[in-house]
């Protein structure tokens, strides 16, 4: 493998699995050039740069649900496909792998138009539109969850798991040092972009958490950081660590006893690999409610508790969190259940699949 393009964008749920595969490729093939192709308007350019990857941006945005703005988005998609097509000619990839999102639509379609081998990876239990369309033009579809097997042609599918970055795999392989019973640590994450409903629920819970001696590490998202930071200061919660974005999420997982977060596919996969008990609050407006489906995968196995956003106001959130953090035996059982669902080998399985695909797929020149 000499040159590979990974294409996706929009949210960390698409981006981080791509970065995990990039890590695996570079570990196995140090001379291989990996190019990240994403959108111009999301966090992917910054995240790719932090991972040491070259980046090409495409002027693509979502088309569905944008009303009159869909016209401009459609022109942007056409321009994105044209730019991706030109990049394919210059970079000359051996293979292209898409991880969903509109940038992946442009990138994978351009690869197929150029006659380059291509594959896609679906993270969620309910497939997104991009991958449902692209599955018709690629020979291989990598899946994260068995629930998705019936959504694509069976001869194309490979159940590989959702790739997780090596630092998180290492976190899961190491058992946390035993802590005194009075030490209780809550990690709060609303995804790469934050989650206002989760942020507000935690702020309302701060007095009770402080009284119970709970330490909090809180990822707010950039838009909410200043407001939530002030709320912590006003409530006098001296044990709170508030950040817009946590760069070293593996260290955060290793630190935490319990995680309160959304139920994006990548978050769910990371929780499983890291072996972390969780309270999951699915984003209620996700396409096809896929976050609720993702959450139920862990909840049904005893690794997480489901808290629907519509029920937050009617739920005693402080009692729920403190109750879980005070029950060390239950947390341990949840951790074991989570770890049993993890696929720490997912990135390796995807790269194995790409290598096999290269052996069997003719490449146009």
Swiss-Prot record:
Pfam families: Glyco_tran_28_C, Glyco_transf_28. The keyword Cell cycle applies. Its main location: membrane. Pathway: Cell wall biogenesis; peptidoglycan biosynthesis. One of its GO terms (molecular function) is UDP-N-acetyl-D-glucosamine:N-acetylmuramoyl-L-alanyl-D-glutamyl-meso-2,6-diaminopimelyl-D-alanyl-D-alanine-diphosphoundecaprenol 4-beta-N-acetylglucosaminlytransferase activity. It catalyses: di-trans,octa-cis-undecaprenyl diphospho-N-acetyl-alpha-D-muramoyl-L-alanyl-D-glutamyl-meso-2,6-diaminopimeloyl-D-alanyl-D-alanine + UDP-N-acetyl-alpha-D-glucosamine = di-trans,octa-cis-undecaprenyl diphospho-[N-acetyl-alpha-D-glucosaminyl-(1->4)]-N-acetyl-alpha-D-muramoyl-L-alanyl-D-glutamyl-meso-2,6-diaminopimeloyl-D-alanyl-D-alanine + UDP + H(+). Gene3D superfamilies: Glycogen Phosphorylase B. The keyword Manganese does not apply. It is found in: Cell inner membrane. UDP-N-acetyl-alpha-D-glucosamine binds at residues 11-13, 124, 165, 192, 246, 291. Keywords: Cell cycle, Cell division, Cell inner membrane, Cell membrane, Cell shape, Cell wall biogenesis/degradation, Glycosyltransferase, Membrane, Peptidoglycan synthesis, Transferase. Its EC number is 2.4.1.227. Signal peptide: none annotated. GO terms for biological process: carbohydrate metabolic process; cell division; cell wall organization; lipid glycosylation; peptidoglycan biosynthetic process; regulation of cell shape. It comes from the Bacteria. Cell wall formation. Catalyzes the transfer of a GlcNAc subunit on undecaprenyl-pyrophosphoryl-MurNAc-pentapeptide (lipid intermediate I) to form undecaprenyl-pyrophosphoryl-MurNAc-(pentapeptide)GlcNAc (lipid intermediate II). Belongs to the glycosyltransferase 28 family. MurG subfamily. HAMAP family: MurG (MF_00033). PANTHER family: GLYCOSYLTRANSFERASE, UDP-N-ACETYLGLUCOSAMINE--N-ACETYLMURAMYL-(PENTAPEPTIDE) PYROPHOSPHORYL-UNDECAPRENOL N-ACETYLGLUCOSAMINE TRANSFERASE 1. This is UDP-N-acetylglucosamine--N-acetylmuramyl-(pentapeptide) pyrophosphoryl-undecaprenol N-acetylglucosamine transferase.
């Amino acid at each position: 493998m000499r040159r590979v393009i990974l294409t996706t964008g929009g949210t960390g749920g698409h981006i981080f699995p791509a970065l995990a595969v990039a890590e695996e490729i570079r570990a196995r093939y140090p001379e291989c050039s990996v190019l990240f192709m994403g959108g111009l308007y999301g966090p992917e350019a910054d995240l790719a740069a932090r991972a040491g990857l070259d980046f090409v941006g495409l002027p693509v945005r979502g088309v569905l649900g944008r009303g009159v703005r869909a016209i401009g988005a459609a022109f942007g998609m056409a321009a994105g496909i044209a730019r991706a097509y030109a990049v394919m000619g210059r970079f000359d990839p051996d293979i292209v792998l898409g991880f969903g999102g509109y940038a992946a639509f442009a990138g994978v379609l351009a690869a197929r138009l150029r006659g380059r081998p291509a594959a896609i990876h679906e993270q969620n239990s309910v497939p997104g539109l991009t991958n449902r369309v692209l599955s018709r033009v690629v020979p291989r579809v990598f899946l994260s969850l068995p629930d998705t097997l019936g959504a694509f042609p069976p001869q194309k599918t490979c159940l590989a798991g959702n790739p997780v970055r090596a630092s998180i795999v290492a976190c899961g392989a190491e058992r946390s040092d035993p802590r005194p019973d009075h030490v209780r640590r809550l990690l709060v994450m609303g995804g790469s972009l934050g989650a206002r409903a989760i942020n507000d629920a935690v702020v309302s819970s701060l007095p009770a958490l402080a009284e119970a001696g709970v330490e909090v590490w809180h990822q707010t998202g950039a838009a909410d950081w200043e407001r939530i930071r002030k709320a912590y200061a006003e409530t006098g919660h001296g044990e709170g660590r508030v950040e817009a974005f946590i760069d070293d999420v593996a260290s955060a997982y290793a630190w935490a006893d319990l995680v309160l977060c959304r139920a994006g596919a990548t978050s769910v996969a990371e929780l499983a690999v890291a072996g972390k008990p969780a309270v999951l609050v699915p984003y209620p407006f996700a396409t096809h409610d896929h976050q609720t489906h993702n959450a139920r995968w862990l909840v049904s196995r005893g690794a997480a508790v489901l808290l629907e956003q519509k029920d937050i106001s009617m739920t005693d959130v402080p009692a729920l969190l403190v109750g879980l953090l005070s029950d060390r035996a239950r947390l341990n059982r949840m951790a074991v259940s989570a770890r049993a669902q993890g696929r720490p080998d997912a990135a390796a399985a995807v790269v194995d699949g790409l290598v096999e695909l290269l052996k069997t797929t003719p490449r146009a020149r």
